[in-house]
Amino acid sequence: MDKRALKERLSRVGRVAVLAGGRSAERAVSLKSGAAVHAGLRNLGLLAELVDPADKSVDTLRGFDAAFIALHGRGGEDGVIQGVLEHLEIPYTGSGVMASAIGMDKVRTKQLWKGAGLPTPAFYVAGREEAELGFPVIVKPAHEGSSIGMAKADNTEELGEALVAAEKFDQDVLVEAWVNGPEYTVAVLGDEALPAIRLQTPHVFYDFEAKYQSDSTEYLCPAGLDDADEQALRTLALTAFRVAGCRGWGRVDVMRDEQGQWQLLEVNTVPGMTDHSLVPMAAKATGRDFDVLVGEILLDALERGRG
């Protein structure tokens, strides 16, 4: 949308709370996302204010006309703050309570996708069930984001060590078959799947350091796919997003295995909005600058709130 037209449509919005920080393991990333979103909304002429739920009571939110959620991880991406905002009848960005809770749970998300016949790597939940996946595998805390607590295991000894490390972050730990192949991510904005991004890192996988601290990670957009593969990937991502019940905006992570098949990894209902983040990169490929991106995300929330 043209920035001038967007400003006009947002001109009657009152106070907007930009929720960032929180108490999750992703607090530092959330603060960076919040600062960027806050600046973008102010550039559109909006009365945006940063609110950190770790420092202020939820009563602080009374009197705001809308909320832009930039909280990552527990308490912000799992349906908790969404439930608070529903109770306060404040329109908010992104997915609703249930879809946020599902999206934060890698196991539930994969079960939904599997039930819908969508492709996702074989997996089991450590301590609850076992499956013969062989090696290598990747171990993931079920309710953490930003690749926190994740590790690759090439043998039984490494698997044991990875499980111990992951259990420091989560009592539920996912063990997933390792996929050899390139990793992609597809941002979703409303009903639109944005251009895919291919992620290339010298790390074993796209871990926390590769995401937020490394200068050696490469992001390719266009992703180097032919038109048919690009469209197939975008369609799969949009379908996976909808099957999980998500709305507004988000991101779906996908890999391509050695047989050339797409494999869904996870959905992100509140993706990062830092200078390393992928949604702004995909939006830029469509001609949207950062201010327009955050404005469109907020406008979607307001229009749903009115509906």
Curated annotation (Swiss-Prot):
Record has Cell wall biogenesis/degradation as a keyword: yes
Pathway connected to this protein: Cell wall biogenesis; peptidoglycan biosynthesis
Binding site for Mg(2+) 2: 266, 268
Root EC class: ligase
Recorded GO CC terms: cytosol
Keywords attached to this entry: ATP-binding, Cell shape, Cell wall biogenesis/degradation, Cytoplasm, Ligase, Magnesium, Manganese, Metal-binding, Nucleotide-binding, Peptidoglycan synthesis
Signal peptide bounds: none
Localization (cell): Cytoplasm
Protein family: Belongs to the D-alanine--D-alanine ligase family.
NCBIfam families assigned to the protein according to its UniProt record, in alphabetical order: D_ala_D_alaTIGR, PRK01372.1
Protein name: D-alanine--D-alanine ligase
Organismal lineage: Bacteria, Pseudomonadati, Pseudomonadota, Gammaproteobacteria, Oceanospirillales
Gene: ddl
